[in-house]
Amino acid sequence: MSGKKRTASSTRWMQEHFDDHYVKLAQKRGLRSRAAFKLEELQEKDQLIRPGMTVVDLGAAPGGWSQIAVKLTGDKGKVIACDILPMDPIVGVDFLQGDFREEKVLEALLTRVGADKVDVVLSDMAPNMSGSDGVDQPRAMYLVELALDMCHQVLAPNGSFAVKVFQGEGFDEYMKAVKDAFKVVKTRKPDSSRARSREVYLVATGYKL
């Protein structure tokens, strides 16, 4: 067997082992998805969420990020989650099922937020992938643009934003838009993010619009 083949085989094995580790760890800890570890890593580096904060979690189902957020905000905080898909209840999380592009769903979400605005907007949204970059990338960019629009509607001054973005066409323009809206923007690739994935997370702090 050639060195190249050994390397490819080893890489596949390592990736499978890596994936199994986070899937099993999520199950062991009672977390609903391996994605929860991504938010934990972002929190460890950037301290986005503190006790008493109000957090909006977009694309929340099955609830991995909401599980982490509600622990971090504590009894005096508030987590408002929204997804088109259903999500089993999480104690302390106010879940709204629906498409926030629809006016009635958006109004319901804004009612839950109230007049005080929110401290953090989270988005781990991703489209159903077809395998075609020409289809998937525009869909993915559309979702992250919606998430940034939500910041403009609900985020308090100096608030924070964490969003999953897929690198590709439209990424640079989106990065500029986020930098225009926030004082500091960092790009993160959590260890729990699959190495083969083009996903990265933008962590933006100091909302200024």
Swiss-Prot record:
Annotated protein name in UniProt: Ribosomal RNA large subunit methyltransferase E
InterPro entries membership: RNA_methyltr_RlmE, RNA_MeTrfase_FtsJ_dom, rRNA-MeTfrase_E, SAM-dependent_MTases_sf
Lineage: Bacteria, Pseudomonadati, Pseudomonadota, Gammaproteobacteria, Alteromonadales
Keyword list, A-Z: Cytoplasm, Methyltransferase, rRNA processing, S-adenosyl-L-methionine, Transferase
Reaction catalyzed: uridine(2552) in 23S rRNA + S-adenosyl-L-methionine = 2'-O-methyluridine(2552) in 23S rRNA + S-adenosyl-L-homocysteine + H(+)
Molecular-function GO terms, alphabetical: rRNA (uridine-2'-O-)-methyltransferase activity
Main location: cytoplasm
Organism: Shewanella sp. (strain ANA-3)
Signal peptide (UniProt feature, chain positions): none
Annotated localization: Cytoplasm
Keyword Methyltransferase: yes
Catalytic residues (UniProt): K164 (proton acceptor)
E.C. code: 2.1.1.166
Disulfide bonds: none
Function per UniProt: Specifically methylates the uridine in position 2552 of 23S rRNA at the 2'-O position of the ribose in the fully assembled 50S ribosomal subunit.
